[in-house]
Amino acid sequence: MTYDDSLLSDAHIHLSDFAARFLAAHDVLTIVSTATPEECKTARQLAAANPYVFVSGGIHPWHLPPKNDGGFEMINAINMVDILGEIGLDNVWCDSDLDEQRKWFSDQLKFAINSGRPVVLHIKGMEQEALEILRHHPNTYHVHWYSCPDYLDDYLALGCYMSVGPFPSIDPAVAAVAERTPLDRLLIETDGIDAVRWATGRDVSEDDYPATLVQIASEIAEIRHLTTEDVLRQTRDNLWRFIHSY
């Protein structure tokens, strides 16, 4: 079954040629994640033309500036975004210096609070440490693609929004997020077509993008004993609330 754009949402998609084309033609409520000043500018142009596109940006633990750089270009670009992120801590998928990660994470959390921006979090392998840091920086948080078997309830106790990606049926950690997150804090994300391909091991086409959002919703619906349309409506409403929490 197909669904109208007005029911669809994607809490986290990276800027790409496909994302730019799709969002120029569709009213899917979306947060476009950017990691460079150039991406921020492009995403801002998309957002200017589509009231359902919002921009996130920040210094990702995978892409820390050189120690003597200061990250000034990206810091200036962050002033253009609606939501800060994705930012966080990662000792699994990258070898960035952990002390530098901690510094940038804490500094950006403070900036988000001072500027009134909600935050998208990338946490991998450092869930417990990140949790302790977040407890000292109260804000509105979206934990993107949480894949740790532990600490989920602790993040939920902080009031975090949690997103379900591709797919609960193939990842027990994603299924746990779908099952245990309160309905009013549940979001849907793809992380982009390339991430869907990586997660599924399939050559997913760009034409499959809307169906991917619906499939995630359908799997949540089965877990929560709801209809797919109910889940699509709820997660879109939740994303709108998260975006406008600043």
Regions inferred by a protein language model and the residue ranges of each:
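Mid-domain alpha/beta scaffold segments of enzyme catalytic cores
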Residues: 1-246
